[in-house]
């Protein structure tokens, strides 16, 4: 009975903190974007907006449904976590190499030569973010949205302030690129700081196949 009550309280707390994170994060991002819009050109947002499409598609493949499989599966093991961790990193590296290789073609397609360098830099987000996917999944499994909220808000606020300073100093589109990278880096650092988890030196094909069939 006590366990049931404790779980309910934890679930309610998780829902509340999840709502706090959502609305607070939107408020922070909205405020920062309003100010940055007055400092940057529409073309700066346009370039980053085009690249966001490629990053989102890549991110979907990197995750591959394994995060949801971990969260939904009851009898998950440390081998499962480690397998997903290594899969995410390797897949992220593969997609980054693809973006790096085809960056000149994408830039040529949009008739924007400067996109080549921007793609190769902002694409690092894929690798950085892949390092903390499992950490976030573990916190979700623990229904610990309080820590997730603190991590997300802190990262968004700090990276946003840095982006604003860069925009004010005249760095243009690089303000948005650096803001994105710093946000991803801070998220990863904070996830590692709050959750002291390390993967095993093991990748299991059996675990991979089970999670793949579970998540598909």
Roles of regions detected by a PLM:
Residues 14, 18, 45, 84, ...:
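Alpha-helical transmembrane segments and their helix-entry boundary regions
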């Amino acid at each position: 009975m006590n366990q049931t009550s404790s779980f309910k309280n934890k679930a309610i707390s998780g829902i509340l903190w999840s709502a706090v994170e959502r609305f607070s994060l939107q408020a922070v991002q909205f405020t920062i974007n309003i100010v940055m819009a007055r400092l940057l050109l529409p073309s700066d947002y346009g370039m980053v907006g085009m690249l966001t499409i490629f990053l989102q598609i890549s991110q979907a493949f990197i995750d591959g449904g394994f995060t949801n499989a971990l969260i939904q599966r009851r009898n998950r093991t440390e081998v499962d976590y480690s397998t997903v961790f290594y899969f995410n990193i390797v897949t992220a590296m593969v997609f980054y190499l693809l973006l790096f290789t085809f960056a000149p073609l994408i830039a040529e397609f949009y008739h924007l030569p400067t996109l080549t360098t921007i793609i190769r830099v902002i694409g690092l987000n894929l690798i950085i973010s892949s390092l903390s996917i499992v950490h976030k999944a573990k916190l979700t499994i623990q229904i610990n949205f309080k820590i997730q909220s603190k991590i997300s808000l802190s990262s968004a606020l700090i990276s946003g302030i840095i982006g604003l300073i860069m925009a004010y100093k005249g760095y243009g589109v690089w303000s948005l690129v650096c803001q994105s990278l710093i946000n991803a880096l801070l998220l990863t650092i904070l996830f590692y700081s709050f959750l002291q988890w390390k993967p095993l030196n093991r990748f299991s094909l059996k675990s991979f196949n089970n999670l793949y069939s579970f998540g598909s």
